[in-house]
């Protein structure tokens, strides 16, 4: 967890002068967009993505697939329908070099794809990407027949020597540090000669909604997937080999990126509407309806979207966030402004995210006058009167939006490198000031 010295620009987080009352159109889901790109690239026919997220992580994924030979055409539909991407599969080829940035989905989902390429594919990325675990994917692919050079690091940079096909079959992995290890193998599994059987052997799996998302999206393009939820063995997922269909998919709004805007309603006692909130979804962000209601708000899901209203009071919460760890920074920010203590549990794996999020949240909230203690698997937060100061982001988009939430209630908060929000939420500063009517 280090402050990036190259990002010294400070953004004065707007202070709310009253209750917010806004409708915020949240861009598409990063998790859905990047899974859809991989599945479309592996399909047997062209497919369409409508309203995809255009952000650093998704553009890195699209460019990586283009580097491997996939054609992705970009356009804009009739008025009101938004952007679309047409994905035209092709034989995957090397040699190629893929820049993963610091995108977990790119660094983990694409090495399995690269095993199907005809030639070597080198993966590299931001300095922080070298510290993020990839051993689960690397070791599993070797068991399944792949040749990978990583100098024994279990991390980037690495080279996958694609042979045009991969045998596949059964493999055991410990995915307790990232559910993306499971998703990575499942997404490419239909293209392996024997499919794939992934058996998780470690402690509790984090972020299960993301695995459910992967399974749902695989089934939507014609894959046969057996899961623990569908009567299979515990902690075992099987994907049968077979062709994938090209689909026409409209990407849902990114519900995790709706978090700071919903938090604004809670913090200011106002109202925020998020259009097109799905009635059924596997996105972790859907848990916000329950969590933020428990913290003092109320919500109504209408045909138009989600209407979330703050009561003017913010309550502490004791909550297990193991399945929805990415929501932790925003919840911690709200909890620091509550009327009673909070305990956030089940998120030890956040130490391996874009930064060590538990250490970062503790340090930054405490430097504004807060009282946050790291626990073995989370945070204990005792609300205190906060004051202004610099809130460092550590190149982490969710740290930046958490700082913005604090700034609503605390004058003088300055966020270092708010531009890091472009990873998943382009134009966040404009959306934020627009919500406030600034």
UniProtKB/Swiss-Prot annotation:
GO biological process, one term: chorismate biosynthetic process
Primary residence: cytoplasm
NCBIfam families in the cross-refs: aroA
GO cellular component: cytoplasm
Taxonomic classification: Bacteria, Bacillati, Actinomycetota, Actinomycetes, Kitasatosporales
Subcellular location, record wording: Cytoplasm
Root EC class: transferase
Organism: Streptomyces coelicolor (strain ATCC BAA-471 / A3(2) / M145)
Binding site for 3-phosphoshikimate: 30-31, 35, 178-180, 207, 326, 353
Name of the protein this chain belongs to: 3-phosphoshikimate 1-carboxyvinyltransferase 1
Xref: InterPro entries: Enolpyruvate_Tfrase_dom, Enolpyruvate_Tfrase_sf, EPSP_synthase, EPSP_synthase_CS, RNA3'P_cycl/enolpyr_Trfase_a/b
Pfam families: EPSP_synthase
Binding site for phosphoenolpyruvate: 30, 104, 132, 180, 357, 398, 423
Catalytic residues in the record: 326
Single GO MF annotation: 3-phosphoshikimate 1-carboxyvinyltransferase activity
EC code(s) of this entry: 2.5.1.19
Gene: aroA1
């Amino acid at each position: 967890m280090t402050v990036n010295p190259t990002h010294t620009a400070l953004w004065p987080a707007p202070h709310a002068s009253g209750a917010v009352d806004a409708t915020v159109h949240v861009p598409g889901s990063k998790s859905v967009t990047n899974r859809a790109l991989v599945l479309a690239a592996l399909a047997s026919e062209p497919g369409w993505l409508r309203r995809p997220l255009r952000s650093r992580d998704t553009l890195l994924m699209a460019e990586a697939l283009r580097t491997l030979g996939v054609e992705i055409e970009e356009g804009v539909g009739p008025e009101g329908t938004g952007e679309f991407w047409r994905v035209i599969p092709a034989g995957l080829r090397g040699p190629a070099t893929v820049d993963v940035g610091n995108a977990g989905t790119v660094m983990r989902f694409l090495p399995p794809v690269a095993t199907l390429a005809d030639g070597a594919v080198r993966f590299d990325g931001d300095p922080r990407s070298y510290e993020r675990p990839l051993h689960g994917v690397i070791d599993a692919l070797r068991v399944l027949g792949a040749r990978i050079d990583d100098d024994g690091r279990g991390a980037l940079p690495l080279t996958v020597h694609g042979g045009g096909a991969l045998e596949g079959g059964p493999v055991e992995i410990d995915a307790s540090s990232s559910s993306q290890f499971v998703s990575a193998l499942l997404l490419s599994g239909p293209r392996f000669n024997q499919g794939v059987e992934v058996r998780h052997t470690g402690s509790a799996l984090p972020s299960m909604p993301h695995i459910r998302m992967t399974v749902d999206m695989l089934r939507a393009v014609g894959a046969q997937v057996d899961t623990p939820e569908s009567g299979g063995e515990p902690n075992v997922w099987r994907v049968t080999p077979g062709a994938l269909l090209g689909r026409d998919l409209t990407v849902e709004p990114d519900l995790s990126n709706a978090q700071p805007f919903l938090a604004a309603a809670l913090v200011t006692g106002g109202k925020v509407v998020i259009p097109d909130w799905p009635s059924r979804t596997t996105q972790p962000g859907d848990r916000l309806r329950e969590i933020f209601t428990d913290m003092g708000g109320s919500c109504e899901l209408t045909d138009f979207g989600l209407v979330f209203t703050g009561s003017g009071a913010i309550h502490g919460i004791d909550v297990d966030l193991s399945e929805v760890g990415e929501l932790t920074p925003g919840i911690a920010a709200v909890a620091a402004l509550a009327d009673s203590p909070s305990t956030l549990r089940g998120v030890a794996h956040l130490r391996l995210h874009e930064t060590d999020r538990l250490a970062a949240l503790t340090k930054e909230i405490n430097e504004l006058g807060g009282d946050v203690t790291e626990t073995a698997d989370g945070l204990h937060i005792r609300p205190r009167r906060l004051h202004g100061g610099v809130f460092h982001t550590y190149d982490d988009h969710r740290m930046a939006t958490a700082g913005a939430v604090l700034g609503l209630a605390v004058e003088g908060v300055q966020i270092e490198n708010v531009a890091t929000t472009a990873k998943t939420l382009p134009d966040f500063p404009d959306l934020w000031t627009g919500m406030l009517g600034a």
